[in-house]
């Protein structure tokens, strides 16, 4: 059994170093790192997709070559010539 002094020291130790400040286990740390990497990847993918969508007007398309991102291939008639271009 602990003495009163031992209990006071234990209580003081827990006040100074709470359990929540202990380092997390390896699995939780790895999961958090993976989540951070995935979020960073999603941000990069979103920026790339936005850039592709902004550049829809400069992309030509055919029946075999589609358009980037959410752009769609539309036909236009310029002075009798049919041209297919990607549009948002």
From Swiss-Prot:
Name of the featured protein: Augerpeptide Hhe9a
Keywords, alphabetical: Cleavage on pair of basic residues, Disulfide bond, Secreted, Signal, Toxin
Signal peptide stretch: 1-21
Keyword Hydrolase attached: no
Source organism per UniProt: Hastula hectica
Note on domains (UniProt): The cysteine framework is IX (C-C-C-C-C-C).
Any GO MF annotation of the entry: toxin activity
Residue ranges annotated as propeptide in the record: 22-49
Localization (cell): Secreted
Disulfide bonds: 56-71, 61-73, 67-86
Tissue: Expressed by the venom duct.
Record flagged with keyword Protein biosynthesis: no
């Amino acid at each position: 059994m602990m003495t009163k002094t031992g209990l006071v020291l234990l209580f003081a130790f827990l006040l100074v170093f709470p359990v929540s400040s202990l380092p997390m286990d390896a699995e939780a740390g790895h999961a958090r790192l993976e989540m951070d990497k995935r979020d960073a990847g999603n941000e990069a993918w979103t920026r790339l997709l936005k850039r592709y969508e902004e550049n829809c007007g400069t992309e030509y398309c055919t029946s075999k070559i589609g358009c980037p991102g959410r752009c769609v291939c539309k036909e236009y008639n310029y002075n009798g010539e049919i041209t297919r271009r990607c549009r948002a």
